[in-house]
Amino acid sequence: MSIGKNVARLRRAKSTRLHIRKLGVPRLSVLRTGRHLYAQIFTADGSKVIAAANTLQSQVKGGLKNGKNSLAAIKVGKLIAERARAVGVDRIAFDRSGYLYHGRIKILADAARDAGLKF
């Protein structure tokens, strides 16, 4: 009997998060749904959200047809980097939440790097 796709993704995410917690740096966590993208930066111990951005916010939503394409990923990546730098965070660990580093996840990460985050 095989495990489900989402269960396998969550298992990969758990392993990654344990490794990142040992590093002791803030983590950029990404959630991808069929319609939207969400990005949050957590403290090193994972207890508090420092900055957040998603495709439901008006700064990102303006000018987009929908929140599930690569243009939306670029806007979310730039916005999360801008908000992180505003609170003094420039070095993070990227938590892709078990998703493949491909498509919207990769585009969001590249946009955040271009906007000044280091990971």
Swiss-Prot record:
Keyword Iron on entry: no
One cellular-component annotation, GO: cytosolic large ribosomal subunit
Ranges annotated as spanning the membrane: none
Paired cysteines (S-S): none
Gene3D superfamilies the UniProt entry points to: 3.30.420.100
GO molecular function: 5S rRNA binding; structural constituent of ribosome
Keywords recorded for this protein, A-Z: Ribonucleoprotein, Ribosomal protein, RNA-binding, rRNA-binding
Domain of life the protein comes from: Bacteria
BP-aspect Gene Ontology terms: translation
A Pfam family reported for this protein in Swiss-Prot or TrEMBL: Ribosomal_L18p
Biological role: This is one of the proteins that bind and probably mediate the attachment of the 5S RNA into the large ribosomal subunit, where it forms part of the central protuberance.
Summary of subunit composition and partner proteins: Part of the 50S ribosomal subunit; part of the 5S rRNA/L5/L18/L25 subcomplex. Contacts the 5S and 23S rRNAs.
Family according to the record: Belongs to the universal ribosomal protein uL18 family.
Protein name, per record: Large ribosomal subunit protein uL18
Highest classification ranks of the organism: Bacteria, Pseudomonadati, Pseudomonadota, Gammaproteobacteria, Lysobacterales
